[in-house]
């Protein structure tokens, strides 16, 4: 797991609404999302960080080898980069971003386990 992926602080943590990766708000702004930046372009854009992440999430899992972990398969993160992931993320991506993802062939499924989609 790359050190820049691990949250550097326990304050100001946010989770990506697309992949549930957990980082600080500054890490998302500085590095973007390790899994989704090709689609969400959060790097250097604080407004996109606020739109595409949530500060409200439940539980975290540290994934060193997501491809080998049954937990990562259950959480739907087995194809993602090693890192710290939220179990459930409250919130949804804005409709405009969901439409853009769909036009690029990326299926968006909410990571909020309280909402059945």
Curated annotation (Swiss-Prot):
Entry's Gene Ontology molecular function annotations: zinc ion binding
GO cellular component: DSIF complex
Subcellular location: Nucleus
Domain of life: Eukaryota
PTM notes: Ubiquitinated by Ubr5 when not assembled in the DSIF complex, leading to its degradation: Ubr5 recognizes and binds a degron that is not accessible when Supt4h1b is part of the DSIF complex.
SUPFAM superfamilies membership: RNA polymerase subunits (SSF63393)
UniProt cross-references to InterPro entries, sorted A to Z: RPABC4/Spt4, Spt4, Spt4/RpoE2_Znf, Spt4_sf
Renumbered zinc finger spans (C4-type): 16-36
Keywords: Activator, Metal-binding, Nucleus, Repressor, Transcription, Transcription regulation, Ubl conjugation, Zinc, Zinc-finger
Gene Ontology BP term (one): transcription elongation-coupled chromatin remodeling
Start and end residues of each stretch annotated as Interaction with SUPT5H: 1-40
Tissue: Expressed in brain, heart and liver.
Role: Component of the DRB sensitivity-inducing factor complex (DSIF complex), which regulates mRNA processing and transcription elongation by RNA polymerase II. DSIF positively regulates mRNA capping by stimulating the mRNA guanylyltransferase activity of RNGTT/CAP1A. DSIF also acts cooperatively with the negative elongation factor complex (NELF complex) to enhance transcriptional pausing at sites proximal to the promoter. Transcriptional pausing may facilitate the assembly of an elongation competent RNA polymerase II complex.
Family: Belongs to the SPT4 family.
The protein's assembly and partners: Interacts with SUPT5H to form DSIF. DSIF interacts with the positive transcription elongation factor b complex (P-TEFb complex), which is composed of CDK9 and cyclin-T (CCNT1 or CCNT2). DSIF interacts with RNA polymerase II, and this interaction is reduced by phosphorylation of the C-terminal domain (CTD) of POLR2A by P-TEFb. DSIF also interacts with the NELF complex, which is composed of WHSC2/NELFA, COBRA1/NELFB, TH1L/NELFD and RDBP/NELFE, and this interaction occurs following prior binding of DSIF to RNA polymerase II.
The name this protein goes by in its record: Transcription elongation factor SPT4-B
Organism: Mus musculus
Gene that this polypeptide is encoded by: Supt4h1b
